[in-house]
Every structure is written in structure tokens, then in C-alpha cells.
Amino acid sequence: MSVNVNRSVSDQFYRYKMPRLIAKVEGKGNGIKTVIVNMVDVAKALNRPPTYPTKYFGCELGAQTQFDVKNDRYIVNGSHEANKLQDMLDGFIKKFVLCPECENPETDLHVNPKKQTIGNSCKACGYRGMLDTHHKLCTFILKNPPENSDSGTGKKEKEKKNRKGKDKENGSVSSSETPPPPPPPNEISPPPHTMEEEEDDDWGEDTTEEAQRRRMDEISDHAKVLTLSDDLERTIEERVNILFDFVKKKKEEGVIDSSDKEIVAEAERLDVKAMGPLVLTEVLFNEKIREQIKKYRRHFLRFCHNNKKAQRYLLHGLECVVAMHQAQLISKIPHILKEMYDADLLEEEVIISWSEKASKKYVSKELAKEIRVKAEPFIKWLKEAEEESSGGEEDDEDENIEVVYSKTASVPKVETVKSDNKDDDIDIDAI
């Protein structure tokens, strides 16, 4: 049974069809796997190598894939239903098959491993553009380009030279052959048309404003992809410095207050999201850190929420700020930690773990120890609050116990015992 390649189109006479995926589960236990029986036929209908959609399934499912090209067996580890894979295939088709302009599946991929770019051209509407290379499958495509793909300008130049050589051979006339007769006087021969002119025509033939704008957009997209690839090849230190310059520029331009989403997006692009708080503390904090925690809470929360690694970097960033403004901040450590804790930027577990070991990676060993000594009152308060909460839970459990009274039982004499134990609540402002 066939289905529409673009399943969002419900027209039964839609010309682009593909066979429905057939999945077969094999094996047991840890060796269970799903074999896509007709992957070759499906890939042929999409004009893509069968390894691409199979690898796409692996990326989306977080599963390993196996390719047995000789026997046409394409395998995804684990047990997966055919309907689930069919729905997942729609995502692959949308990202890597359909034209963004006309939504027809008549596209070819043009992979350039040297420049780390993947181009996309449509034979239906003439669209030409660059694919977004953020998806994990793009790494696989760059390493395994399709057979019909251009692998860079070197290949084109080589083909161009070969064509020129063949043209010269075909155009040369040997002495043994008789030259062709000249055309009649009243017949005009067409002007010579070389291969070089044909190759140059497709760039300059359309001079309308819209065509020029489209070409410029393609160039800018191409440049963005190249920049992204170059940045990800840099070291972690270099990428963190790029993020630092980005945040610093936003502050200098006076738009830092509304740039929290852009900063997180840039950190994710550079793959240094966990280290974002370390950069933010350096740019945004000074001796007025307590007021600044409230002001930039949203910025830090985008990094630190449910991210313990980012919270640890925030604490290391705090150490760096204290090192720069030691005279003003060293005595305020407990208050600063309390502000961060109340703002939901730090969790108890992370703070306690940080306090147990001094590190000399960001500040001197002596200063790191002194900071933790100054933080002890707050750490003690945290631990006692945690013990009280756990004790309260035990009391709640005791209250839920059902007591059965007996009329025949003797009632013991109850003596009232005065408790000298008083709850000593710690006032954090008095620390």
C-alpha cells in the first residue's frame, strides 16, 4: 500500500507516492532489533540513500543503527512499531526531502565536506539554498555524501577541464578527413556557444530585484553555516570567549535586560550552555551583586533551572566576583548565597557539595577556603532546615497511625514532662 510522500497533502491523486514502511522486530532481550524490510524502496521513492532515513531514526530514538547494504537490511536497535517509524519518517521528509518553497519532493542534496555545508536544489521550482546543519544526521551526511552530490569546487573544475579536453578532441579535424562543406550563402550559421558561457549563464541570467535578493539570502545562509561549523571546531575556551564577547556587546549596547533568550540561544549554539553562568557573573556582577541577582534573575534562571552543572559554575563565578571585590564582599558571602538560594538559582545539594571541597581552579586555594569558612553559617542553616523537614515528615507518619483502644486495658498514669528544648530559629540577617 502506498502513501503520499508529503502526508500533510490529503489529495488521493497526489503524484508523489511512496510505499508504507514495513517493520519487523527480531531477537529477544538486549539483542532485540527492528528490521525495516522495504527501506530500499522507500528511500528510492524519496531519492535519498536508504542509510539516511535509517540513521535519522537512530538519532531521534537514541538507538544504534546497522546497515547491511549487500543484503538490503537496515536495522534500528530496540523494538519499534511501524506506525511510530512512519510518523518519524515524516520529520525526515520535511527536513531533508521537501523543497522549502514549493513543498515538492524533487530536491537534490549537494554536500561539500570540505566547507561542511549541505546545499539543497529543487528541480520543480528552481529553488537553491542551504540546509540547517544543526541536526545530528547532518554530520552523517557530510561524512557519507550521496553519489550524485557535488563534493566541492575541485570536482567541478576537474569535470570542466575534462569537458574542455573532449571539446578540443571532438573539434579537431585530422588531415585524412575531409572538412565539412560550408553552409549555403543564404543560410546563417548560429554563433559558437562554449561550455563556459553555459556555466556562467545560470548566475547572471535573472537580474530582477527579487532574484538578486534571493541570491544574497543564499550567500548569507551559506556564511552562517560556515561560521557555525568553524565555531564548533574551536576549543571550549575559545567558544566561552565568543559567548563572553556576545554578552559584553549586549551590555554595551544597553539591551542586556531583554537579551536573556538570545544569550541562551548563543550558548546552545556554541555548545557551552552549562558554562553560561560563569560568563554572566563576570559581565553582570560587581560589588552590588545582591541587587544584581534580583535584576538579572531571569538570565541566570534560564541556565540554572534543573541544571546542577550550571549551578556549580555559578558558584565558581561567585568566587571570581569575590576575588575582584574582596574587601566589599567577603563578609557578605552568607547573604549572597541566601539571595541566590531564594531566587531558585541554587539547590541545597549543590551548595553543600560545593562547600565541602575548596578548588584552586578559579581563585587561589586560600581565598577559596576563606569563602567557604565565611559561608559556614548559611551552610549550617541549610543542613538544619533539611533535618527539620525530614523530622517533620516522620511526625506526619506517626499521626497517620490508627490506635485501637480496649475497654479492659488499664490506663497508666501519665506524668507531664516539661521540655527544656526550644526551637532555635536562625535569623539569616543576623549572620
From Swiss-Prot:
Annotated gene: EIF5
Residues found modified as Phosphoserine: 10, 229, 389-390, 410, 419
Name this polypeptide is given: Eukaryotic translation initiation factor 5
Family classification: Belongs to the eIF-2-beta/eIF-5 family.
Domain W2: start-end pairs: 233-392
Keywords: Cytoplasm, GTP-binding, GTPase activation, Initiation factor, Isopeptide bond, Nucleotide-binding, Phosphoprotein, Protein biosynthesis, Ubl conjugation
Biased composition range(s): Acidic residues: 196-209
Record localization: Cytoplasm
Record CDD domains: W2_eIF5 (cd11561)
Compositional bias (Basic and acidic residues): 153-170
GO cellular component, one term: cytosol
Organism for this UniProt entry: Pongo abelii
Binding sites annotated in the UniProt record for GTP: 27-34
Site (Arginine finger): 15
